[in-house]
Amino acid sequence: MAKEFSRTRRIAQQLQQELAQVLQRDMKDPRIGFVTVNDVDVSRDLSYAKVYVTFFEEDEKLVEQKVAALDAAAGYIRSLVAGRMKLRVMPELRFIYDSSLVEGMRMSNLVSRVISNDEAKQKQHGVETDAEQGDTKEEGDK
């Protein structure tokens, strides 16, 4: 059982690399633009592959159009990748927009904003921050 899983994972990794090359070099569709293949999940029977992609654009409408263009070209992309990989059955490709990168950046910005707001409030009220308290303790120890 574990051996079968490792094979699907290896195929998913190779498929990710081949898809990235095909999408960068061989696709001439201007609707797609620059696309990054973040991850590929292959079903156990190798009949389906979920391809997680991101784009530079964050506009939902543009992202939907780009994913639709990829889905429309999935058969062509599949045939290009099949020529590069030695598989008996080439998985059917399903493209999915991966918003985890955008969400991660948004969460990071929120955390940074909260930290800076807390530091500003502490300075207004005359409360020392943890870093400043550590400096005064070291000076007192000397």
From Swiss-Prot:
Subcellular location: Cytoplasm
Region (Disordered): 119-142
Top-level taxonomic group: Bacteria
Pfam families: RBFA
InterPro entries in UniProt: KH_dom-like_a/b (IPR015946), RbfA (IPR000238), RbfA_dom_sf (IPR023799), Ribosome-bd_factorA_CS (IPR020053)
GO biological process, one term: maturation of SSU-rRNA
Membership in a protein family: Belongs to the RbfA family.
Primary role: One of several proteins that assist in the late maturation steps of the functional core of the 30S ribosomal subunit. Associates with free 30S ribosomal subunits (but not with 30S subunits that are part of 70S ribosomes or polysomes). Required for efficient processing of 16S rRNA. May interact with the 5'-terminal helix region of 16S rRNA.
Subunit annotation: Monomer. Binds 30S ribosomal subunits, but not 50S ribosomal subunits or 70S ribosomes.
Name listed for the protein in its UniProt record: Ribosome-binding factor A
Species of the source: Shewanella pealeana (strain ATCC 700345 / ANG-SQ1)
